[in-house]
Amino acid sequence: MRSPGRPSVTSPPLRGEIVAAFGRHFLVKTADESTLTCVLRGKKSGAACGDWVEIYQTASEQGVIERILPRSALLYRSDLSREKLIAANATQVIIVVAPVPSFSEELINRCLVAAESQQLSVLIVLNKTDLLGPSKVALNGLSLYRELDYTLLPISARNDVKPLLPYLEDNLSVLVGQSGMGKSTIINALVPDAERATGDISPTLDAGRHTTTHARLYHLDRNARIIDSPGIQQFGLQHLSIEAIAWGFREFRPYIGKCKFNNCRHSGEPGCALANAMRESEVSVRRIDLYHKLIASLNTNRIPSSSSRTKIQ
């Protein structure tokens, strides 16, 4: 797709929602249900699936994004070199795990911290419960998150996805998880023509064989929408401060600000309220260890100030 020319100043802008994102190409659905393949104007900051945008139409099925409208939330991950936008304006993060292949608990906690930083609700879905023995082991391992008041939903998407439906109502949910956890099975059960719709986008966005690596938004009904995001193996949190990461562990919050030293990182400093809570078994040793892994992975030279807890544009 060639870069579009500047439209006539007399043509009115259209408002639409990004329903598919692949690199610098976006599929935007407008109010009349038509879709335009769009690119961002100039060097504007990145857009994400779920963004509401103002666009100018430049051809029958093409347009240019002139403005990204204010967001209520932005879920994204970051490493030392770049940021990867996942979804905009979501209200719920659905973390999909399965007993086979094995899932990463560190990745679950990274997703939880990212969701908490944007004040998004969280649902943890244990898929493939038809694998009875492995599922029992996985459920035992995930019971900690139920104790932390996260909702844990066991399902077998290949057999019955209906238990998930009530959690989707009145939400824009985004599915996240490692490859192989069954996210595609869930989407195909919820949206029977999802594979065809995804195939249609391939030539439109010139995505070729990488089609499965883009985010896609589906309307299930007028009150339920869901974004399928690419499978991830890492979830960098370089954009969050140490304070924000600690806040992302919800059970830590009663102890934050009660340490002997204001700059306590909860990593063995004397008078640490969180360490005392762990010794009193009020906080899980497992979660403390996971927190230490997260902050150890940060490059402290790139950590923003404690006031930079979100990135809403």
UniProtKB/Swiss-Prot annotation:
GO-annotated biological processes: ribosomal small subunit biogenesis
InterPro entries the record matches: G_CP_dom, NA-bd_OB-fold, P-loop_NTPase, Ribosome_biogen_GTPase_RsgA, RsgA_GTPase_dom, RsgA_N
Annotated residues for binding of Zn(2+): 259, 264, 266, 272
Chief localisation class: cytoplasm
Cofactor binding summary note: Binds 1 zinc ion per subunit.
GO MF terms held by the record: GTP binding; GTPase activity; metal ion binding; rRNA binding
The protein's name in its UniProt record: Small ribosomal subunit biogenesis GTPase RsgA
Species name: Nitrosospira multiformis (strain ATCC 25196 / NCIMB 11849 / C 71)
